[in-house]
Design a protein with these regions (language model features):
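Basic-flanked hydrophobic alpha-helices used for secretion and membrane insertion
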Residues: 102, 110-188
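Short glycine/proline-enriched coil/turn segments at helix->beta-strand junctions
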Residues: 1, 50-53, 87, 106-108, ...
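Short, acidic/polar N-cap/turn motifs at the starts of alpha helices
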Residues: 5, 44, 145-147
Length: 188
């Protein structure tokens, strides 16, 4: 103890430097933790907001063992099978793809979710209309009632709400029927 106190007295600069480095490393770790948490949230916030307690994928056909939203296609027969399973209250299909949306001179990359009209509070109620997340509406500079284009088709903005992100792109919800037509036309 005596030697440590004597070292502190005679080498103050060294101990201040070491203490400063430890404090800066602690601050850096805190910043990096916040950054990774924010990036993770922006990557999957729309998926986390999906109402339900399970998500079902089809078996990958491309030889991989990991299912993904972009490769999974659940047939109507598979959907009916899951609906009949014990403990399942309901089954809702959802389509997920990535594309570009346009409104006037504004263009932005977006994630498009095809959902049933009763899927969530912000789901569009009819074909030809879309629900935009707040970031998507800001990027396209549109509000409720404006029109946007996705893959050459025009849609009316019915709702602007939420902070949905998927794969670091803002989310647009459209009806499942519109999404299936868009998906078939673009191969998405």
């Amino acid at each position: 103890m005596f030697v440590a106190l004597r070292d502190l007295r005679f080498a103050r600069g060294r101990f201040i430097l070491i203490g400063s480095v430890v404090a800066l490393i602690t601050i850096l770790v805190g910043f990096l933790s916040g950054l990774t948490g924010g990036l993770a949230t922006q990557n999957i916030s729309a998926v986390l907001a999906i109402p339900g307690d399970r998500i079902v994928f089809s078996t990958p056909t491309n030889g991989t063992s990991t299912p993904s939203y972009s490769d999974s296609t659940v047939t109507e027969q598979q959907s009916k099978m899951w609906s009949a399973a014990d403990g399942v209250a309901s089954v809702e299909p959802i389509g997920v793809s990535q594309t570009r949306a346009e409104a006037g001179d504004a263009r932005t990359a977006v994630a498009v979710f095809g959902v049933q009209p009763r899927f969530d509070d912000t789901a569009p109620t009819q074909d030809g209309s879309v629900s935009l997340s707040t970031p998507a509406a800001a990027d396209l500079d549109v509000t409720v009632g404006d029109e946007i284009q996705i893959a050459g088709s025009t849609y009316t903005v019915e709702t602007v709400a939420g902070e949905g992100w998927y794969s670091h792109t803002p989310v647009i919800e459209m009806t499942l029927g519109d999404w299936q037509g868009y998906s078939a036309a673009t191969g998405a």
